[in-house]
Every structure is written in structure tokens, then in C-alpha cells.
Amino acid sequence: MKKNRLNLNGVVVINKAKDISSNKVLQQLKYLFNAQKVGHTGTLDPMATGVLPICFGRATKIAQYLLDADKEYIATIRLGIETDSGDAEGEIIAKSINIPELSAEYLETVLAKFRGDVVQIPPMYSALKYNGQPLYKLAREGKTVEVKSRNIKIYELELLEFNIDSLKIRVKCSKGTYIRSLAIDIGKTLGCGGHLIALQRTQSGPFKLSEAFRLEQLKDLSFEQKIASITNIESVFIDKPIYSLLEEEKDDLYKRGLFADKPHLDGTVRIYDVEKFVAIAEFDKGKLINKKFFDQDILISE
């Protein structure tokens, strides 16, 4: 007889291993925790490793916040070889022996072109859709379509190391950034082509690799230890400012969903009632435009 699944609420930060899909990680986690409802916050390619936050129960309501959050990666680019997918899993489509002589100074001039606001074309092998069809399905059928460019932001781009035909970089970027496309574009700028051979996500929103669990670690934990690995919903917003409700504002907010204009508030704000986190609110130049209520104390609900 199947055990009743638990209605858990919160986030588990996984350190995804190589060669496993994000969906498989999600399903294994659902089984390990006997959880009723789980959801991910954007996938990592099977070849990629690193931070993959998984939301449980009520935390699935705020998955979009993590999808929209900034990310940080460590990426290794192989020069002189291009693949159809832009990474090591694709078929080789071009080779070049004209790899320029690399130096830290030369590579810095190249990387400088990709810092700040960047227009990027996503790769064909991606989950983006064209007329309702995922691009990767069209690519596997040998079809090519015009992929619309998108505006992204690369906040930090640091050269970590390099050798005769490869370089390793650290990238801190906005949502929607494809590191495979960045690898392709860097290869083109160097005049020899290139593709991504390793990718590790080191941060997603507030969650860092140092606090992530490997699936193998979780399998060895007791039930109590597994529950302790779930971080609360507020942790998703730990870098957001706090607004403490005034006594006279509580009825308007709780009973009528109203909130007086707050000219000094903008963007995402944590709402506190005394010392308790109760909601996330979105403000646009002081006007409340969206809100979500949470019971921070409930980790396992009925």
C-alpha cells in the first residue's frame, strides 16, 4: 500500500551531478521525501552540474522568482571546434587550426566586449519554442529557423585560467542568458570558433553551491535530517528589503487586500507582521501591484 505523500513546504538546494536531467533529479527528490508536490526553478542541461533549487508545496508558488533571479556559472570553452548544439554533446560541424596565440591581456579585450548589456541569440538546441514547438525538437529533425535575439545582462565576466586551446571563465548574469551562446560568440570573436565543454552553476538567486546537497547525501539521511535540509520560503527573498506592517494597516491588507501607497518602496519587498514573515509584495513606484501570503512556520501542512 502506497504511503500518503507529505505536503512539504520549502526549498531544497541540490548540487546536480553530470549526465542526469533536471527532471530526473526532481522525480528522485519527490520519491526520497515522499513529497506531494514538487517543482523546479528552471532546468540545467544534463552535462551541466551545480545549483538546482527544487520547490516543495507552497514554495512552488514562488518558483518564478528563482527563474527570474540572477545566476552565476563557471564555464570551460574549447576553442577551434564548433558543434551544432554549442556544447560537447553535439555533433562537430566545423574545425579550425587558426586558434590565435592567447594571453591574459588579449583575452581580457575579448571578454570586455561581453560585459554589460548584451544582445544574444539563443542556441537552436534549447527549450524555447517556435510556433509551439521546442527548438531542440526542430533541431533534432535537422530544421533551422530564425531564432529571435534577446537582451541579457552580464554583470561580471572573469577569466579564471586558459591554455593553448581552451579557457575557463566565471559568469554572473541575468535570467535568459545562455552560456552555450556565450561560448559560441567568444569563439567567433577569437576567429576560431568554440563550444562549451563544462558548465557548473555556482549560484541561483540567493542559493550558493556551498549550501547545496548531492542526491547521494540526501539518500543517506534519516527522515528528520531530510526535513532539516528544507530551507524555508523566506530564504528565496533573503536579499530583499523588509517592511513591517503598522497596526492600522493589518486589517486593510489581510481582509481587503489593500495597501496604502508607499512612495519609498519599489520592486520585491518582504512583509513582516511584528517579527514574522507573512507575505511577499511587489511594488511599482510605491503602488502595490501583487502580493503572496505565506505561513512561514508551516513546514509540513495538512
Swiss-Prot record:
Keywords: Isomerase, tRNA processing. Its EC number is 5.4.99.25. It catalyses: uridine(55) in tRNA = pseudouridine(55) in tRNA. Signal peptide: none annotated. It comes from the Bacteria. The active site is at D45. GO terms for molecular function: RNA binding; tRNA pseudouridine(55) synthase activity. It holds the Pfam family TruB_C_2. GO terms for biological process: mRNA pseudouridine synthesis; tRNA pseudouridine synthesis. InterPro entries: PsdUridine_synth_cat_dom_sf, PsdUridine_synth_N, tRNA_psdUridine_synth_TruB, TruB_C. NCBIfam families: TruB. HAMAP family: TruB_bact. Responsible for synthesis of pseudouridine from uracil-55 in the psi GC loop of transfer RNAs. Belongs to the pseudouridine synthase TruB family. Type 1 subfamily. PANTHER family: PSEUDOURIDYLATE SYNTHASE TRUB1, TRNA-PSEUDOURIDINE SYNTHASE. This is tRNA pseudouridine synthase B. It comes from Francisella tularensis subsp. tularensis (strain WY96-3418). The gene is truB.
